[in-house]
Structures are given as C-alpha cells and as structure tokens.
C-alpha cells in the first residue's frame, strides 16, 4: 500500500479543537474532509490486550447496515432490544451500539475523540469494534488504534482465503499488517431501466445493452440517442464519477504534491458536455431530484451503482409506495422489476464497510468470532446474499450463486451475482490512499459550479486548489494534466 498521510501535531490539534478540518470557501458546501487520525500514545501502542473477555461489546458505526447484518446473521445473537440499542449474545455479553451519522464528518470526529480516550476509558466503555469506509480506511489502518487481524485477533490465512484480494489490500497497513475485514465486496455495474433501453436501443437484454455501452465512445453515442427520444442518459453530475476516479494512474497525493489525474478531467469534459447538451438532469448525488429520477416518474436510462446501491438504494427509490408506507417490494409497485444491470464502459468499485478491532479491547475472542462468522463463513455469507441481494466477500459462495438458477425479481429475473462475480476480481486498489474521500468530495463540489455555468473552467480549478490547501495545509502544490 502507498505510504500513509503525514499528520503534523498542529493539524491534529486543530482537528481535535474544532471537530472538523478547515472549511474552504468558494465551493465547500458538503461534509468536511476526513480529519486526521488520532495518534496513539506509546503506552497504548505497547499495551497488551487483557486476557479475560469482557461482558460488554461496544460497536461504533454510522448507520444501521452492519447492525442489521449482525443481528440477523451472527449465530451467537440471543435477543435484540426493542429499541435496537443493545444486542444480547448467548454467553450473556451485551453489545452496545453507538451510531453517529456521517453528516459533516460527525462519525469520524466522534470516533477520533473516543479513540484518543481509549486508554483511560473504563473497560466497559472502551470501543471494541468500529466500522470504516473505503475512502478513509487508511487513516485508521495506519494508526495504532486498529488491531492486526491475524497477529492480534487470531484469524488465519485459511480463514481469509476466500475473500477478494482488493478487500484486504485496502485495509493493509504500510507494514503489511491486515487491520480489518469485511462481509461485502462492492464491484460496480451500470443499472438501467429495461423499458427505456427498449425505447432507445430496441432491446433490454443485458448482453446486447452491454455491447452498446462497452466503452465511453459508445456510451456517449447512446446518450445522444437517448436524448433524441426524450430521455436522459444520466441523472446528474456525479453519477459517472466513481467509474473515472477508480481508473486513475496514480494516488491523489505524493509527498506534498496533489496531482489531478487526466481521467478525472475526462469526467469533467464529459459531464460538462452532458450538461450543455441536456444528456443529464443536472442533479447531484443523493438529492431529492436524483432519487426521484430512479422512480416511476424518472426518464433516466441508468445509474452507476455498486452492490449495496442496487439493493439498498435503487430498489427503495424504484417503489411508488415505500415499504414504510405499506408498499411491497414487488412487480407493480413503481418500476420494481424494470431494472437490469450490465458491466458498462469500465470496471470500478464504490464503497464498502470494514470491521476493525480496536486497540485496548477486552473482547478479542468475541471480535475474532464476529469477524470469522460474518466475513469468512461461506454458508452465512451465501445466505446474506440470497436474502438481501448484497454481494458478499466470499468467492466460493458467490461463484456458487453465480452458477445457480438464482434470480432477482427486482432486476426482472436477472442473476446479477454472475456479473458481479466477473467484475470483482478486476478491482485494483493500488492507487487508493488516505486522501481519497476529501479530494474526491472537493473535486465534485468545486466543479459543480462549472457544470451549472456559474464559473468558468479556470475558476473551478482555482476554487479546487484553494479548497484542497485549506483542507490539507501539508499540500503545497497541485498539478493539472497538460
């Protein structure tokens, strides 16, 4: 893995005093950049985990996704509190859930504060497990606050042998130690509306649609065809971003220099063209209009989504009557059943959640059992996929489903696991780095004004440079492709 971000004492102090990194002017309107990872004291780094198992397991996360997976599939669960704040295990251990939403860097800021207090915290208050996302995983992986999955926790190479390599690469520290593990792999595909594909291309067959979208030139050609028939190719500015950003030639930052990859400028060029020609709906990721474009009133051909996005976001947005309002996940409710997936113009991944054991935990045995059960047990992982359509991190289980008669009703009877199984081994994490979240967010936000037509290209670049240098004072130079 690439060397970790260098954090100065001044920067760390600023992060802890303010709770967030400096907010830039000009184009910074969303969550702040990933704050600096807390630096462990020498005493914490050298301390040994207590031998006795505690009876309280503290798990920190930012939403209820892992909580649901844990409560539904961890074999040792005995009962769940009515308010879901605690889970009791068969041996009497009480799992306490701390869920702090991601908004405005809230999760990381509170996690950092808690980790800084980890050494002095009472045994039942210490964090035992915490979750991290791909975009900032290295921040914690390269700190002393994460346990070595093999050396400290006790999982073996055999336990981990069926996992996709990239899911281990992203949580391997600069010394080669594996510092986390995950139940999911998140290869990306292009999810398209079958009815719109028929109107534009004359077919909704995934193999034939893929032929029309297999590279960016073909993709752009179909965008023109869709526009001519009254449809949008994409909903907004950010939809294709991950497909470009996952195919860069180098990490964002080397020493004190940030380099904007040429492929990111290809995204800028394409997105500006789509905005000018009406090929997109000028939305932004996660806004109401973007989500509405995925539902019954939408006129958008497709969306770039990874595994979790299809079953967790797209399915929900496709329904006319949400499940919370009494609707059912079935054909006839909105456009459920009108989607299908194909590989699209380039392989990519998006997101993912990793389980990390926290330094100082007195529940090493329980952490080991949780990791082994939820990220290595092929039977459990196969059940997660068949129940939820989430793509799990077990090659054996996924190949079994890929080669079966499994069908997704949401995707019109398609076995999308087969496509994911083809794409997942191609994911390359060699250019991932600890700056990814902050740099990617800044790129998208600062160029939105350019896509909207309120600033020119040079101003958008200047805004990006200003934002980056305010977020990351250690970055002194930003290079653009010629």
What are these regions (language model features)?
Residues 9, 22-138, 382-385, 455-482:
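Conserved N-terminal structural module of periplasmic/extracytoplasmic solute-binding proteins
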Residues 12, 16-20:
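Hydrophobic core
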Residues 40-46, 108, 119, 130-189, ...:
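Hinge/lid segment of periplasmic solute-binding proteins
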Residues 69, 194, 372-402:
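Periplasmic-binding protein-like
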Residues 71-75, 266-369:
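Extracytoplasmic/periplasmic substrate-binding proteins
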Residues 100-113, 214-218, 282-296:
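Short helix-initiation/N-cap motifs at beta->coil->alpha
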Residues 150-161, 169-240, 252-285, 359-365, ...:
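Helix-loop-helix "hinge/cap" segment bordering the ligand-binding cleft or interdomain interface
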Residues 336-337, 385-449, 477-482:
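Long, aromatic- and glycine/proline-rich binding clefts that accommodate carbohydrate-like moieties
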